[in-house]
Amino acid sequence: MHLAVFGGTFDPPHNGHLAMALFARELLPADRILISVSDNPLKPACGASDRQRLDMAELLSLEINRTGMNAEVTGWELQQPRPSYTVDLLRFVRSSHPDANLTLIVGEDSYQDFPRWRDPEGIFALADVAVFRRRGEDESDEIAGDSRVRCIAFDAPVSSTMVREFSATGKSLRGLVPETVMQYILSEGLYREA
């Protein structure tokens, strides 16, 4: 079994996250995807509670499952002492799936901070790493020069920051997030300007 591990704050999950999961299915190819909701120790919290982020990640997993891929959500990292670290998540996943081929899915923006992550070499020992880079961006020498990293060109002109900004200014989120996530954001009153 090939298991893709997709960690992030998912504050909120958006159509770019959905597309990354579908790309992982086709290009890795991954049989299953594990969506791990976490805090980012390198960034400040943005607004949704842990419970709300888990709820929205569950809605994202339902969208992924509708495409025929098996997706599940874990809040394991949120239950750990803060900050939690990717290497610890991968150790946990490896203990639960000792025979699985693991691939960590990382966006290019997150990978830029990879040298600051806890135990990067341990991460490489536990899993392959697939970096999704935005099309049209200059290729980073750091990524291009690392044979342990698989780069996947990816075009998703949406980010969680954009979704939060649109929500705060009352702009429509249609086309930026799955419909169910949009309804959740609206019903919970998330990301409104204070």
Swiss-Prot record:
It catalyses: nicotinate beta-D-ribonucleotide + ATP + H(+) = deamido-NAD(+) + diphosphate. One of its GO terms (molecular function) is ATP binding. Pathway: Cofactor biosynthesis; NAD(+) biosynthesis; deamido-NAD(+) from nicotinate D-ribonucleotide: step 1/1. It is an enzyme of class 2 (transferase). Pfam families: CTP_transf_like. Its EC number is 2.7.7.18. GO terms for biological process: NAD biosynthetic process. Signal peptide: none annotated. Keywords: ATP-binding, NAD, Nucleotide-binding, Nucleotidyltransferase, Pyridine nucleotide biosynthesis, Transferase. Gene3D superfamilies: HUPs. Belongs to the NadD family. NCBIfam families: cyt_tran_rel, nicotinate (nicotinamide) nucleotide adenylyltransferase. HAMAP family: NaMN_adenylyltr. Catalyzes the reversible adenylation of nicotinate mononucleotide (NaMN) to nicotinic acid adenine dinucleotide (NaAD). This is Probable nicotinate-nucleotide adenylyltransferase. It comes from Chlorobium luteolum (strain DSM 273 / BCRC 81028 / 2530) (Pelodictyon luteolum). The gene is nadD.
